[in-house]
Amino acid sequence: MTAKFLRSSAVLIAFALAVSVGAKVSTAQYGGGGRDIPAQPSQPAAEKGDKSEKGEKPAKVNKAEEAAYKALYTARTGTPESQIPLCEDFIAKFPQSHYLVGVYSQLTSAYFAADQIDKMFAAGTKAVELNPDNIDVLALLAMAMSRRVKPSMPDAKQQYEKAETYAHHAIELIPNMAKPDTIDDATFEKAKNDKLAMAHSGLGLIDLQVHDKPEDARTELTQAVQLASNPDPVDYYLLGNADVKASYFNDAVAAYEKCAATGPLVAACKSRQESAKKDATTKMGR
């Protein structure tokens, strides 16, 4: 899952900052978007000019803040290891900055890519507190929380409900996003679909493992693998499990085959594929 994110993080983080840093800001990988149309790209003040619409005097620029944000903005397509200290340092030095929502969004994605999941949840929660319509973070948390939370945890019910709320809200917001001028149509659609895929992935896992609704899980997980520009093998694994539980054994064989091609679950997928093949010949399937 993390490797998949790393392959696409450059485009997604660039997209996240483009639609997220402003009056209504967002980053979830894979924040962007708001209840209203998301703000246009927020670049360092030295690049965009900080003049008011009424011709008033420009707001006083904190040169240290602008320099720090410029370095962070430039690093948005780099490795998570290069972004994390810049984001953390910015937050510590400028806790009241108007750039803060975008910084927390970028930090959430960077923590996820670096597999620092607990820190990712903390940063993501802060990003959503600052902007409840942060599409990037909503989608990322919906997917990551559903995989991280275990039914045995004391607060599992509340965490699953929160993940579902994040997923549904992201799915509600994404179709109404406005394309930033800095991004072409194809890149914009790809980014939107990748976010939708993450939200549907989270819902599918919860339908399967929490609500015991394999048919609903199949619907959500099918959307996840169809929408994703680079489908997550974990989603194919979960889809195969949902297929088996709903007695779609031949579909399960196909899902496990795709899961077994790459990723962290190759051995498990191959084993389950063989089991599904036997079920297809010995059990009443659909």
Model-flagged regions — what are they?
Residues 22-102, 286:
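N-terminal leader/linker segments that initiate helical-solenoid repeat arrays
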Residues 32-34, 180-182, 193-205, 209, ...:
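Terminal, low-structured helical/coil segments at or just beyond the last alpha-helical repeat
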Residues 68-71, 104, 138, 145, ...:
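TPR repeat positional signature
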Residues 77, 114, 148, 157, ...:
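Structural motif corresponding to the intra-repeat A-B loop/turn of tetratricopeptide repeats
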Residues 93-100, 130-135, 175-194, 226-231, ...:
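Short solvent-exposed coil/turn linkers within tandem alpha-helical repeat scaffolds
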Residues 109, 143, 147-150, 205, ...:
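Residue-level recognition of tetratricopeptide repeat
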